[in-house]
A protein has these predicted regions:
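Vicinal oxygen chelate
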Residues: 16, 70-117
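Short, charged/polar surface micro-motifs in flexible loops or helix N-caps
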Residues: 48-51, 61, 75-79
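Core segments of cupin and vicinal oxygen chelate
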Residues: 11-51
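Short beta->alpha transition motifs characteristic of CBS
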Residues: 104, 123-128
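Short glycine-enriched loop/turn motifs at secondary-structure junctions
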Residues: 3-5, 62-67, 104-105
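N-terminal beta-strand motif that seeds the catalytic metal site of vicinal oxygen chelate
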Residues: 1-17, 68-70, 127
């Protein structure tokens, strides 16, 4: 039996424009058409077959735990850190040390930071 594939992840956001800008300009995702055209939805392509769906309308920005996070793989964690630094976005390692990188036992580098709604994002250089 074929394993299921991930179609999309939906994230409920407070300020849709701010989140759109973050995922497009900071994370580097490409916007794609969405079928609703109601001003409450934005969709982005993730890799070859998956999507991120932002849904506006959250009542407030709330705190989230780091263990619940989205993860994006990039070619260079160091280059990505330069983007965060340029945009004054703080990052930390898995333990919570500011401006630090975690290197996993398999050699993958990873960092953590928050999106505009307080959702944790991991960025790593895994090539799987």
């Amino acid at each position: 039996m074929k394993s299921p594939t991930l179609n999309h992840v939906a994230v409920y956001v407070y300020d849709l424009k701010k989140s759109n800008d973050f995922y497009k300009d900071i994370i580097g995702l490409t916007p794609i058409p969405e079928p609703f055209h109601d001003g409450k939805h934005s969709w982005f392509k993730i890799g070859e077959h998956s999507q991120l769906h932002l849904i506006g309308g959250a009542a407030a920005v709330i705190s989230h735990v780091k263990n619940s996070h989205l993860c994006f793989s990039v070619a260079s964690v160091d280059s990505f850190i330069a983007t965060l630094t340029k945009n004054n976005i703080p990052f930390e390692n898995a333990k919570g040390d500011a401006n630090a990188i975690t290197t996993r036992p398999d050699g993958v580098k990873q960092i953590y930071f928050k999106d505009p709604d307080g959702y944790w994002i991991e960025v790593n250089n895994d090539t799987y």
